[in-house]
Amino acid sequence: NVKAGDLGGFVEGEHNLETELSDSAWIFDDAIACGSAYVNQDSSLHNTAIACDHAYVSCGSALYGQARAEDDAYLRGAVMCGNAYASGFAQIICGPDKFKPPILSGHCKVCGSVRGNVKVCGAGAVLPGEEILNDLKDITVLISDSGRRILRGTVKDTLRPRKEHAPQKEKSKKRGMER
């Protein structure tokens, strides 16, 4: 929680950061919010992360390391770390299951739309106009420099034990009956 007098990163102006007491959005360390970028709704920038141009960072989004959101990037409930980069009209949005936010890490670049349980890492990329949507809890879409994969959770991989059936008694056949 942020208290009055706490020092944070660089904020170009009041237009970059929500200042309502009920909102704990904050710029930490040497992070920067500049241009027309806006950070609100409990979101945060850490380390040397940057939100610039018209980037909108909201709904608990967090940028760490040297992550950068620029141009008209829209982040809602997302996590960016390392040298992750969101630009253009990128949309990185948490799905209905808020416990599995989209995660961008490494040197990845997102210029398209990512929603839900999606991880973009390494040198992975989502191109302008491309949409990666996954609202399933037990499946993760992984985009990396080695390709795109679907990772299944362990829930689907466990089999129920097989039921043991008692041996059935043979029915006696009546004589004289035809089949």
Predicted regions mapped to residue ranges:
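Glycine-rich hexapeptide-repeat left-handed beta-helix
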Residues: 38-153
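Residue-level signal for functionally critical sites in structured catalytic/ligand-binding pockets
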Residues: 12, 69, 176
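Polar/charged, compositionally biased leader and regulatory segments
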Residues: 3-13, 122, 139-141, 179
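Extended, small-residue-rich solenoid/repeat segments and analogous flexible loops
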Residues: 1-42, 47-54, 59
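Gram-negative host-targeted secretion-system effectors, predominantly Type III and Type IV
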Residues: 134-178
